[in-house]
Amino acid sequence: MASVWKRLQRVGKHASKFQFVASYQELMVECTKKWQPDKLVVVWTRRSRRKSSKAHSWQPGIKNPYRGVVVWPVPENIEITVTLFKDPHAEEFEDKEWTFVIENESPSGRRKALATSSINMKQYASPMPTQTDVKLKFKPLSKKVVSAALQFSLSCIFLREGKATDEDMQSLASLMSMKQADIGNLDDFEEDNEDDDENRVNQEEKAAKITEIVNQLNALSSLDEDQDDCIKQANMRSAKSASSSEELINKLNFLDEAEKDLATVNSNPFDDPDAAELNPFGDPDSEEPITETASPRKTEDSFYNNSYNPFKEVQTPQYLNPFDEPEAFVTIKDSPPQSTKRKNIRPVDMSKYLYADSSKTEEEELDESNPFYEPKSTPPPNNLVNPVQELETERRVKRKAPAPPVLSPKTGVLNENTVSAGKDLSTSPKPSPIPSPVLGRKPNASQSLLVWCKEVTKNYRGVKITNFTTSWRNGLSFCAILHHFRPDLIDYKSLNPQDIKENNKKAYDGFASIGISRLLEPSDMVLLAIPDKLTVMTYLYQIRAHFSGQELNVVQIEENSSKSTYKVGNYETDTNSSVDQEKFYAELSDLKREPELQQPISGAVDFLSQDDSVFVNDSGVGESESEHQTPDDHLSPSTASPYCRRTKSDTEPQKSQQSSGRTSGSDDPGICSNTDSTQAQVLLGKKRLLKAETLELSDLYVSDKKKDMSPPFICEETDEQKLQTLDIGSNLEKEKLENSRSLECRSDPESPIKKTSLSPTSKLGYSYSRDLDLAKKKHASLRQTESDPDADRTTLNHADHSSKIVQHRLLSRQEELKERARVLLEQARRDAALKAGNKHNTNTATPFCNRQLSDQQDEERRRQLRERARQLIAEARSGVKMSELPSYGEMAAEKLKERSKASGDENDNIEIDTNEEIPEGFVVGGGDELTNLENDLDTPEQNSKLVDLKLKKLLEVQPQVANSPSSAAQKAVTESSEQDMKSGTEDLRTERLQKTTERFRNPVVFSKDSTVRKTQLQSFSQYIENRPEMKRQRSIQEDTKKGNEEKAAITETQRKPSEDEVLNKGFKDTSQYVVGELAALENEQKQIDTRAALVEKRLRYLMDTGRNTEEEEAMMQEWFMLVNKKNALIRRMNQLSLLEKEHDLERRYELLNRELRAMLAIEDWQKTEAQKRREQLLLDELVALVNKRDALVRDLDAQEKQAEEEDEHLERTLEQNKGKMAKKEEKCVLQ
């Protein structure tokens, strides 16, 4: 089979087929003195294709007797057909070399290569018929040859062109060029569902084993001296075993029937149990199951009521519970009761082969009548499972792991898999027929894929999937999968199971139409009796990835492929991705009705689930996979999310047992065991709430009504009530953080970015509407200096200690926090009164309730809101942690402070002002946020945890270790803020604070990691910014419009602030910009191609040998990962191709404008050289586009004028002609 990766490389490329004709004219070969060739043959070859010339005798020359020449008096023509491929953007075809080999043919006919030379066929390819004279110099392969040369003419004729994946572009020879395929009679394999590529047993081996088995039977039956008939039967079998393997199988089938006849006559008691042993599941498989079962039973009872018969014990458990099949074999082999000599291993093996053949004949009968009814040929008893699947179980168990003790706990392994590989338990009562799909606590990629395929196709007639080879040959299985997900693309009922080529063609065309790379062709299945396993697996993996949302998309391309970033799913962080709000709100309302689990440990579990959803490449640069959970997906979040986590475990085989267990356990939606269902619900519910909670903040009154909470005027609560409530939330938060931190460290030691998710302080920074933040920034900064600085420094250092130290100090810090909160409340009141008096000349005793604030104060708040929005934009761009966190009002501040202290986070050096005074403008603009905080505090077991988890997801990859560059910058800014705030006057504080804000807007430290990952923030915040606002909120929204627009622009560019070629799914550009991205993609492809070639070679070797299952599994995981990356690159290149062909100038103009605005939003000093070049390219492109558009407008204008002139001319002409016609009519008179 041709290399799978080669086919994957050809996806999206153009192909042209050429016919080349070589006309040999003269061959010169110079030899050593001691040797001369007999006859020479020129072979033109590539891989397994060979085109040989006739043998010609070598004639020594006159001048140099060691140099001889072969001359063709009539040129000999050798023709080949070559398919050349090229990238849509490339000018020339890809390289394809054919080799000329000069061979010496001895008198005995033996050939030996003497010299070789290769030519690149693309150099001679031409769309027009051409003929080229070629003189090739050869490289000697033998010491006997000194030099060689060949003169010939090479003609090229262009045949046709098309897509590289078109069937007529595939060379039939190349389909089988990688290895010799096992080609047999297609009709035989049509009904054969037994063949598994890795478990093939050739006929000679089968014959030898059957002979051995027959001898064992002979010995077994000879033990009973009274049963002469059985001895004769065995002798008869023994004599027949010398014949060919095919004959043996037919004879043994006949003998099997003869044994059943003997059993009915009761002539041989051994035959009854033996027949049953040969076919332990004979009831459902035979044509008359009930009678056949009853007859041996009666005979057995009449002859053997004692336990003399060793097979009697086996039958009952096998019929009652097919899952006990391995234990039954254990009983036979390892723990025989009385007659040890009679209980031999061989009768079991006998059943293995004989039963295989009997099932095969039964399938043949069914196929000849109606193959669609193959799985339901006869109604089995209720307590029996599908006999064909059990057959496959029996075969695989015996071939793969013949030692029965290993197989006996199979049921237990399957139960364990409910957690570690939940996909393996389908909703049907049958377990996976293959031994445990978990190898070394890692999910078995191939087995989980097989189970997925079975699950998807389980109700389709004519489909029975047991392997990755013959089960797929007639195309019905592929068609069933396509019909399951896209019934509009294929009419399954109209398919003919005998039409292999047409079935496969319909399936492959359907998958290609929805963007799945085409790796198989109908001719593969027609020509190859046993399709290539790796190709089928890879194709199926692509199909599963597509329909389950596991497809990767390019985020950022680096020079080194291992550092490039991909994300799972097709979620767009682009603000123009236009998520349907109706869908989003509908989903939100559904989520709010879901019950929430309140165990504190579930918080830690959910932390782990969030960590698992971060896709980490080899370099550890992460991207949140939760981005792909949009309502636009055809899968619901509950479906997409587990698949997201599944991919993580696929790509990182070194995952811990707990992590891999959960990820694979939720791999297939709705298929969970009892032990895992609760956990899965927690994970799904929490994960979905992460997305929905952001919208919940905007439902000002809706959230109040749903949760029966108090109105959004927080000042009505007393300080003591608040602090008590905060204490409850704080305790829960501490416990949760401790659990999550310890579990998280164990979860994935490879990822350096995951420990950054534990700062609730920084999380809250982006949780609520940005419009609130700046309003109380002054209070926050002032309270920083007046709070206890020693405790703050201790807290900062505390972040570097282990979680154990945090736990020891939690109780003492609780009391400290309470006291500090009370002090801050008093200070907040005094500060608010002072500020109101100084700035607005209002009453010095400003009331503490929202309703009494002046209009001037509202204006000041709005101005501060705009300032805060700009600051947040700068923070998001720079990766600096939020040293000056927003004041959300008393509840938010206190809650934030409690959480921060409880978690031992470094941001504890920031104190939040808890001024009870909340201006009316704030309730108008952000009352929903405050209300939501209040709701959180009233139900701390639920909402505080969920809000915190949501915020963790938003900022989970932001570096937060105390010694990181970004945190160092934050510390510096915070300390400078503290110094500034110690001055006495309010005006000076305001001035200094503005300077601090400017520092945020022009940050000193630029964190590369954060630039890659910060886009997740906007994927949630855009819904807040674009949500339907309440009427009272619009005034503030208008004021902050400019800030929001700037944020949207920054969002678009955050993926590519410091890289040469960064791929932004939200942007499309033309011309030079496209060329630059394509260059980066091609570089990435080359690196992936190099690695994939090695992986495929090694994987094929491991699959053929089957020696190292763990390495094979690791290679399989890496292979699937590479395939997924390759498909992501293919999709990106297709997008760029479409964009390049975009001839709509208006659309191009909009796209260019959009990209340019995003570029210009970055400060000049922050731009790299690459970004400056790209910006210049965009400007040039835009200017050229404007010029083109102007030229078009002028042309159109000229054309319109010309058209008007022509219309006028036509009108004049018509009027003149009309007058002439009228005159003629007047002259016409009837006579």
From Swiss-Prot:
Annotated phenotype, changing residue 395 to T: In a breast cancer sample; somatic mutation
SMART domains according to UniProt: CH, DUF3585
Start-end of Acidic residues biased regions: 905-919
Gene Ontology process terms (BP): endocytosis; protein transport
Localization annotation: Cytoplasm; Membrane; Endosome
Disordered: annotated span: 264-318, 358-440, 616-675, 737-764, 777-800, 837-865, 895-941, 960-996, 1025-1065, 1198-1231
Residue ranges with Polar residues bias: 302-318, 654-675, 754-764, 839-849, 960-976
Classification via SUPFAM superfamilies: Calponin-homology domain, CH-domain
Major location category of this protein: cytoplasm
Keyword annotations from UniProtKB, A to Z: Coiled coil, Cytoplasm, Endocytosis, Endosome, Lipoprotein, Membrane, Phosphoprotein, Prenylation, Protein transport, Transport
Comp. bias (Basic and acidic residues): 625-635, 737-753, 790-800, 895-904, 979-996, 1026-1065, 1209-1231
In-chain residues carrying the UniProt-annotated modification Phosphothreonine: 694
GO cellular-component term (any): cytosol
Residues modified to Phosphoserine: 171, 174, 177, 222, 302, 307, 335, 408, 426, 428, 432, 436, 636, 710, 781, 854, 964, 1058
Domain bMERB: start-end pairs: 1056-1212
Purpose of the protein: May play a role in actin reorganization. Links clathrin-mediated endocytosis to the actin cytoskeleton. May act as Rab effector protein and play a role in vesicle trafficking. Required for perinuclear sorting and insulin-regulated recycling of SLC2A4/GLUT4 in adipocytes.
PANTHER family recorded: CALPONIN HOMOLOGY DOMAIN-CONTAINING PROTEIN DDB_G0272472-RELATED (PTHR23167), EH DOMAIN-BINDING PROTEIN 1 (PTHR23167:SF43)
Oligomeric and partner information: Interacts with EHD1. Interacts with EHD2. Interacts with RAB8A, RAB10, RAB13 and RAB15 (in their GTP-bound forms); at least in case of RAB8A may bind 2 molecules of RAB8A simultaneously through a high and a low affinity binding site, respectively.
Entry's disease: Prostate cancer, hereditary, 12: A condition associated with familial predisposition to cancer of the prostate. Most prostate cancers are adenocarcinomas that develop in the acini of the prostatic ducts. Other rare histopathologic types of prostate cancer that occur in approximately 5% of patients include small cell carcinoma, mucinous carcinoma, prostatic ductal carcinoma, transitional cell carcinoma, squamous cell carcinoma, basal cell carcinoma, adenoid cystic carcinoma (basaloid), signet-ring cell carcinoma and neuroendocrine carcinoma.
Protein name (record): EH domain-binding protein 1
Species this chain originates from: Homo sapiens (Human)
Lineage of source species: Eukaryota, Metazoa, Chordata, Craniata, Vertebrata
Gene: EHBP1
